[in-house]
Structure formats: structure tokens, C-alpha cells
């Protein structure tokens, strides 16, 4: 009843009634879902090459004629493009387009995942060109009408292995004893115009994808690791929310700004814990200029936490798995 249809294909189905139950029979394949598969290359006893797909839903091996193996060796992981779809008298036929390497080789597992799930790993040339035209630094024109937060001590705080630094914080003490907390988010929208190549690329990708040893960023590098990365020592455009927090942890007023910041340091949760909780002398010496800032942050945290407890909030401390 499958009529050579494969997983994900769009098909026309005829529905029959068999003993009172509906039963379908595929009449025609309208659109093939996948014209490229990843799998392991093998050679059978007769010397014929084929690829066994890693997708358990694709049970038919892909025959690879001589001369289209791309130099693959038995046991290597490969990408294979389907040249001929199955018929009642023949199976899948394809040619190897890329040899990824042995499964145990470093990075091959990542390459397999990227191709198996068809993750876009190359940026559209138009999007790259649009990003490169933006330049490497912000200009005087970019900052017109923006609030300058550069004089404030500013830090990013992320995990040890973080690759994106797109949010930063500032914290000042007001004369009334309240705190003035600033949360600053990289202003991506300043650079990405609706309908442009970058906008279309971001819409297609939808998100960044992170692997242990690499990242597939939603935007090309000039934005992802450049203008929209809040690296220390460089001016960056941000969207800022400034909040006045009273002694009981309540936000009594707030302001929104188009801003400019200059991060003073890239901090990690590990370093902050060593500074505040463990009170490690070396960490406190290394970041001596920032210790007062983080002690203020700890004060605000305790006020916010106490307010959450009074409201009956539940905090789930879930362990994150790392490989």
C-alpha cells in the first residue's frame, strides 16, 4: 500500500472500507521530502556499494553505482543525494556528495546531525554581503538619539562555554537607598531591516543552534560575533530597560531606552560564585574593581528573592546535563 513512498513524502491516498474500518492505499507520490540522506557506506560481497541511512524510518538502502562513490571507503559516514527514486522493479539509487569521515572521528557526529536534520550551516551570500556592509564598529550616526551608558560599569555574565554575549547589566545605588538596575540587550533590530536579506535569513533559520565545539548562528559572523556581541572594551548598540528597585525588592518605576554601552568585563557564573559565595581571594583580587558592583548585585538578588518567597513562588533547581 505504500507504493514506494518514503517517510515525509506528500502523497495522495485512496481510503477504502475494509470490514467496517478505514484503510488507506497510496495512489501517487506528490512531493519527495528528502533528496539527500546521511548514512554509512558499505560494499556488499559482490562489490556493489550502498549507503544505509541513519534514519531508522528509511529502511531501503541507497545503491551507489561505481564512479559515484566520491572516494568513500567502507565504514565511513557520507551524505548521499538521491538520483533515482524507487519503482516496483528497482530501489533507491544515489551518488555520494560528501565524505564526512569515520563515526569516531572528532566532529563527525556534529556534521551528521547538521545534515540529518537539514540545518542550514552556510549563510546566504546576500545575507553575508549585507552584514559585511554594516562594518565592524558602530558609527557616529548610529548613536544619534541614544542614551550613553558607557560611563557606567557594565558586565556580561554567562556560562563558561557561552559563545554569544547579547545581554549585559549595570547597577547603581540611588540617594534614596534604592537600586537602579539596567538590563541591556544587543539591538539586533537596528541592523536587520524588514524584508532585507538578513531578515529573510533569520526567518528561515529561526534560531541559533549550538554544538559542543561549534555554533550555527542565526546571523552571519559580522553580526553574531561582531556588532551584536557585547564584547568588552567596544561600544555596542542596545535596547535598555532601567528599573528602580526598592528595599523590599519591588520595581517602583522603569524606563526604556535606545542605548549605547561599553562592557567592562566578560564574567562567568563560576567566577561570580567564587567571588561572592566562596570568597576566593585570588578571584576577588583579579576582579577587584568589580567586587563592589557584584556585592550590590547580591544585595538586590536577596531582596528580589525574599519578595518571591513572600509571594509563594516555587524555584525548581534543575541540573543541566553536560557532555
Question: What is each of the regions a protein language model found here?
Answer:
Residues 1-182, 189-234, 294:
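Charge-lined substrate channels and their catalytic hotspots, especially those that engage the 3′ end
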Residues 141-145, 300-303, 307:
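Inter-domain linker/hinge segments that demarcate the starts of reverse transcriptase
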Residues 152, 236-240, 318-320:
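Active-site lining segments that contact anionic ligands and/or coordinate catalytic metals
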Residues 169-173, 179, 243-245, 255-258, ...:
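Short beta-strand elements
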Residues 177, 248-250, 312:
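Detector for glycine-centered tight turns/loop "hinges" at secondary-structure junctions
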Residues 184-186, 244:
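Short beta-strand segments
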Residues 235-300:
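Polynucleotide-recognition surfaces of large bacterial nucleic-acid defense/processing enzymes
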Residues 302-323:
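Core structural elements
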